[in-house]
Amino acid sequence: MAVPRRKTSPSRRGMRRSADAISKPTYAEDKDSGELRRPHHLDLKTGMYKGRQVLKAKSDS
């Protein structure tokens, strides 16, 4: 069984764990409707993505 030669230092342990942090999602303001949406995601209310109609817009009913 493999055994580490040296004890992992606190600095190296912290650098390894730095990638585990969870960041809050970013939002971008939609140019047409002015509502917030995720970047690189389509707007589900209007069905638009990059200025093109991709899906049918949700109806209010």
From Swiss-Prot:
Gene Ontology molecular function: structural constituent of ribosome
GO BP field: translation
Keyword Cytoplasm assigned: no
CC terms in the record's Gene Ontology section: large ribosomal subunit
Region (Disordered): 1-61
Biased composition (Basic residues): 1-16
InterPro entries: Ribosomal_bL32, Ribosomal_bL32_bact, Ribosomal_zn-bd
Keyword Ribonucleoprotein recorded: yes
Superkingdom of origin organism: Bacteria
Segments of skewed composition (Basic and acidic residues): 27-44
Transmembrane segments: none
Pfam families for this protein: Ribosomal_L32p (PF01783)
Keywords: Ribonucleoprotein, Ribosomal protein
HAMAP family (alphabetical): Ribosomal_bL32 (MF_00340)
Family assignment from sequence similarity: Belongs to the bacterial ribosomal protein bL32 family.
UniProt protein name: Large ribosomal subunit protein bL32
